[in-house]
Amino acid sequence: MLEQTTFNAPDGAPYQLITLQNENGMRVQFMDWGATWLSCKVPVNDTLREVLLGCKVDNYPTHQSYLGASVGRYANRIANAQFELNGELIKLSSNQGKHQLHGGEGFDKRRWNIQECGENFVCFSLHSVDGDQGFPGNVDVSVTYTLTGDNSVKIEYAGMCDKDTALNLTNHTYFNLENAEQGSDVREHTLRLNADFYLPVDNEGIPNSPLKHVVNTSFDFRIAKPIKQDFLQGDQQATKGYDHSFIVNKAWQKPCVLLTSPTGDLSLEVRTSQAALQVYTGNYLAGTPTRNGELYADFSGIALETQCLPDTPNHPEWQNYGGIQKAGGRYYQWTEFKFK
């Protein structure tokens, strides 16, 4: 179902909202502004439960938490808002101190075109011009959301560029499987990660070390444990909690994530073609508006952002995990979120 708001976005036109529903009654909603995943209501014990943090539609252009947004041209941080590519120093717009986060004034702040819409899917597309936020090359990207009959949402990202460039797309949804409307403490959830290595960062979120093995650290989620169990230990102290990338093991073959509600009545499995996963426990969510006009607290939701590693354009040793897109080559990644 396609509808539009009675009020306008910053570009002077109404927001376009698309709602999909499957035979189980699961209902998801998306928006053309930021190609945003607005809502996900999952059947649990004969009721529909909202599992995504969200705010009122007219708050999306101004809030600072990227709720449900499609993020690009480069998700995560690029140190000092610059990198070298093919012998040329590329200078980017900075939007987090001296660094660039999530592509600067990025794809989350644009109106995407509704390219195609069907009973169980919607495809958004966007053109990013050469020099957009400092990035080289014209880029055409698309994001396709599909709601399946087994209560999964699959997100597919595709892109083409006419110059070598940095390209790393993700979705910035925050999950809370217990109470996404008010935002109960997500650290009460249980988390399992199919990941052996994580990437330490400094207090500005910039990598400051090679990849580390998770063994004997608070980043070892290979056996499911409550998120709160080892919270704020070790390398987490620099970032007020988890805000780190993990290298995931063959994530397309088996889930890289299993997130379970505190009571165990709902779980989320994540599979992806991406090499890495940023786990962010909402350490700075305080003050973000809710759908009912109240404010979320810190740790109200967890973002599970499938992507390549942060600051990859400045680290050739990580570029085998993605991050640099060659001119004329096809960019394609997918992630599937399954509720059960």
Curated annotation (Swiss-Prot):
It holds the Pfam family Aldose_epim. Gene3D superfamilies: 2.70.98.10. It is an enzyme of class 5 (isomerase). It is found in: Cytoplasm. Substrate binds at residues 77, 243. Keywords: Carbohydrate metabolism, Cytoplasm, Isomerase. The keyword Transmembrane does not apply. It catalyses: alpha-D-glucose = beta-D-glucose. GO terms for biological process: galactose catabolic process via UDP-galactose, Leloir pathway; glucose metabolic process. SUPFAM superfamilies: Galactose mutarotase-like. Its main location: cytoplasm. One of its GO terms (cellular component) is cytoplasm. It comes from the Bacteria. Its EC number is 5.1.3.3. Pathway: Carbohydrate metabolism; hexose metabolism. The keyword Cytoplasm applies. Mutarotase converts alpha-aldose to the beta-anomer. It is active on D-glucose, L-arabinose, D-xylose, D-galactose, maltose and lactose. Belongs to the aldose epimerase family. This is Aldose 1-epimerase.
